[in-house]
Amino acid sequence: MAEKIDINRIQRDMFIEYKGEPYRVVDYDHVKPGKGQAFVRVKAKNMNTGNAIEITYKSSDSIELADFEQVFAEFSYKDADEYHFLTQNTHEMISINAEDIKEEAKFLKEGMTVVVFIYKNKPIGIELPKAVELEVIETDPGFKGDTAAGGSKPAKLETGAVIQVPFFINEGDIVKVDTRTGQYLERLDRAQKK
């Protein structure tokens, strides 16, 4: 049986079980109204369906932690409808339905190490590194003076993702991207690229 904890100990990225389904806590808010009992509002993402919900708990409630296994694995390849990962410890192949990791796949690159989440012996999702380094393969050229006004332009990355980058970024540049928000962080020198 899964462990139960006091709702006041909840944290972002914690895995909980709600109505028999696994959820990942996206955000939470402790609310203390002027009248009445304090409560905790939790925003969570269903790890099976990807749907987000909001759950309200009394401050005296306890929640059940979802019994997840987390496995480090390296992304190997993608076929028609699945992504395939090689576990680091056991060197077993794990396959995940492409629909289950649609958002994460935008920044997934061959050889990248990720965390695979396994729930009741079924892989249901992955966690990417917080930031990834990717090459810009397509963007409009920057012009002298563009940077004075600030602003941004779309750029297509080697994984197919399209993000907004500053005007001074050119094709062939290596950029660091936050995988949680999809935002450009910085441009890297080619020598800095791992």
UniProtKB/Swiss-Prot annotation:
Species in which this protein is naturally found: Hydrogenobaculum sp. (strain Y04AAS1)
Top-rank taxon, per record: Bacteria
Associated pathway: Protein biosynthesis; polypeptide chain elongation
A Gene Ontology cellular-component term: cytoplasm
Taxonomic classification: Bacteria, Pseudomonadati, Aquificota, Aquificia, Aquificales
Family assignment from sequence similarity: Belongs to the elongation factor P family.
Cellular location(s): Cytoplasm
Functional description taken from the UniProt entry: Involved in peptide bond synthesis. Stimulates efficient translation and peptide-bond synthesis on native or reconstituted 70S ribosomes in vitro. Probably functions indirectly by altering the affinity of the ribosome for aminoacyl-tRNA, thus increasing their reactivity as acceptors for peptidyl transferase.
GO-annotated biological processes: peptide biosynthetic process
Designated name of the protein: Elongation factor P
UniProt xrefs under PANTHER family: ELONGATION FACTOR P, ELONGATION FACTOR P (EF-P) FAMILY PROTEIN
PROSITE patterns in alphabetical order: EFP
Gene3D superfamilies (alphabetical): 2.30.30.30, Nucleic acid-binding proteins
UniProt main location, coarse: cytoplasm
UniProt KW keywords: Cytoplasm, Elongation factor, Protein biosynthesis
InterPro entries reported in the protein's UniProt record: Elong-fact-P_C, NA-bd_OB-fold, Rib_uL2_dom2, Transl_elong_fac_P/YeiP, Transl_elong_KOW-like, Transl_elong_P/YeiP_cen, Transl_elong_P/YeiP_CS, Transl_elongation_fac_P
Gene Ontology MF terms: translation elongation factor activity
